[in-house]
A protein has these predicted regions:
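A short alpha-helical cap/connector motif
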Residues: 1-72, 76-107
């Protein structure tokens, strides 16, 4: 089975994706290994710094004006939050882009 970062970087390479959004950074290892030219990370556990937004995803999406080629959702795993992240991600996804969802905790 391919590792998450291999899948993400493979999609970037295969599709020529330039911009990447990651919701939920964990320890930041995967985010730092992403090869996209432009990348934004969103996680309330981090401070606002550089390309990292230290906020909940709902707050980020209200203020966001950018669009992305690839969006990886791995924030809160509650089904309602993931649903909001999908809806909000769809609104800022470039044509021909991809949304990846890591996992969801039903109810």
């Amino acid at each position: 089975m391919r590792a998450r970062i291999d899948i993400i970087n493979g999609l970037i390479d295969e599709n020529g994706y330039k911009s990447y959004l990651e919701i939920g950074l964990g320890d930041g290892t995967h985010f730092n290994a992403v090869k996209a030219e432009q990348k934004i990370g969103v996680d309330p556990a981090y401070p606002n710094e550089g390309n990292i937004y230290g906020a909940e995803s709902d707050t980020f999406f209200v203020a966001n004006t950018q669009s992305f080629d690839l969006i990886f959702i791995d924030g809160l795993h509650h089904s309602r939050q993931v649903e909001r992240d999908i809806v909000n991600s769809w609104k800022c996804l470039n044509k021909g882009g991809t949304i990846l969802i890591h996992d969801i905790k039903p109810k």
